[in-house]
Amino acid sequence: MAKEELIELDGIVDEVLPDSRYRVTLDNGVVVGAYASGQMRRHRIRILAGDRVTLELSVYDLTKGRINFRHKDERRSDAAPRASARRR
């Protein structure tokens, strides 16, 4: 059986909810509930309110999505680079 087609959309995280869930407003104005993908959880990528994200929606339920990418924030580009941790 072939995997179903997913719809990829961009949006902005409005609110961080309990249990690793998020409320995201898509670029077209629709508000959906979302969760972080397994890769993002495994690599401990933090998602905060105001972050720009890409999510996948199933064609069967357009109210829930999976966040699979957090875009780089242009505002943080002027911050000093993090000092490397030294092992002893």
From Swiss-Prot:
Subcellular localization, as worded in the UniProt entry: Cytoplasm
Any one GO CC term of the record: cytosol
Pfam families on file: eIF-1a
GO terms of molecular function: ribosome binding; rRNA binding; translation initiation factor activity
S1-like domain ranges (all copies): 1-72
Keywords from the named record: Cytoplasm, Initiation factor, Protein biosynthesis, RNA-binding, rRNA-binding
Primary location recorded for the protein, binned into one broad class: cytoplasm
Function: One of the essential components for the initiation of protein synthesis. Stabilizes the binding of IF-2 and IF-3 on the 30S subunit to which N-formylmethionyl-tRNA(fMet) subsequently binds. Helps modulate mRNA selection, yielding the 30S pre-initiation complex (PIC). Upon addition of the 50S ribosomal subunit IF-1, IF-2 and IF-3 are released leaving the mature 70S translation initiation complex.
Subunit structure, interactors included: Component of the 30S ribosomal translation pre-initiation complex which assembles on the 30S ribosome in the order IF-2 and IF-3, IF-1 and N-formylmethionyl-tRNA(fMet); mRNA recruitment can occur at any time during PIC assembly.
Sequence similarity: Belongs to the IF-1 family.
Name this protein carries in UniProt: Translation initiation factor IF-1 1
Species annotation: Burkholderia mallei (strain ATCC 23344)
Organism classification: Bacteria, Pseudomonadati, Pseudomonadota, Betaproteobacteria, Burkholderiales
Gene behind this protein: infA1
